[in-house]
Swiss-Prot record:
Lumenal topological domain residue ranges: 29-59, 115-130
Regions crossing the membrane: 10-28, 60-84, 92-114, 131-160
UniProt keyword list: Endoplasmic reticulum, Membrane, Protein transport, Translocation, Transmembrane, Transmembrane helix, Transport
Phylogenetic lineage: Eukaryota, Fungi, Dikarya, Ascomycota, Saccharomycotina
Intervals, Cytoplasmic compartment: 1-9, 85-91, 161-210
UniProt membrane topology term: Multi-pass membrane protein
SMART domains: SHR3_chaperone
One GO process term, biological-process aspect: protein folding
Organism: Saccharomyces cerevisiae (strain ATCC 204508 / S288c)
Biased composition (Basic residues): 201-210
Region (Disordered) location: 178-210
Biased composition (Basic and acidic residues): 178-199
Role played: Involved in amino acid permease processing and required for the efficient translocation of structurally related amino acid permeases from the endoplasmic reticulum to the plasma membrane. SHR3 may function as a permease-specific 'adaptor' molecule that functions in conjunction with the SEC62/SEC63 complex. Yeast cells may require SHR3 to expedite the processing of permeases to ensure their rapid expression at the plasma membrane in response to changing environmental conditions.
Protein known as: Secretory component protein SHR3
Amino acid sequence: MFSYSDFCSIGTAMILSATTFLMGVFFSNMPYDYHLLFNPNSTQEHFDLALRHYQILHETPLPVIVTLCVVAGIGLVGGTIKVFKPNPELQMFEYCSLGLYVLAICVFLTNVKTGIDCSVSHNWGEVTENQGLAVIASSNIILLVMFAGVIILQIGLWYSNWDLQKRLKEFYAQEEREAANAGKKTEKVDNAKKNDNKSKGAQKRKNAKK
């Protein structure tokens, strides 16, 4: 039977696998987003290329979208497993990790997904097309930062649990050594008492013979 700690290990693997996969998906937009956000010499051509890129993403086949949703769901399941019975000393980090993951999904749905739809409809609301594309690019950067935060938290939690288990093993080993030493001392005292009693008994018998 699996213990809860075993399920937590599986949950950590699920979170890390899903998060790194999603980071790769959004990082693939960086060749277009970089020029919109960080290139001071960006031209309208860069915005046109980014627009075309997001228009192509809008035509993503349904099986690919379903796969992306399944991967995101795996991360959510892993996070739920870990917050079911969290370590009281580390539970805030577990909650923050799951919260960051959920918030990243919300940012995708409200900013990136909406922006991709707008790239096709050209209905950008109160902002210009270039500003809307910059918002999508900024949202992708925010997503990468959030997912990186999830990974850092999970690595920190794993290390904390590993260090705790290591310290517990050392503590129990020390307790066993102390108990063994105490047992040896007690045995020596008992043997000394027995020898002393034997000596006294022998002395009494000698005195009785006299």
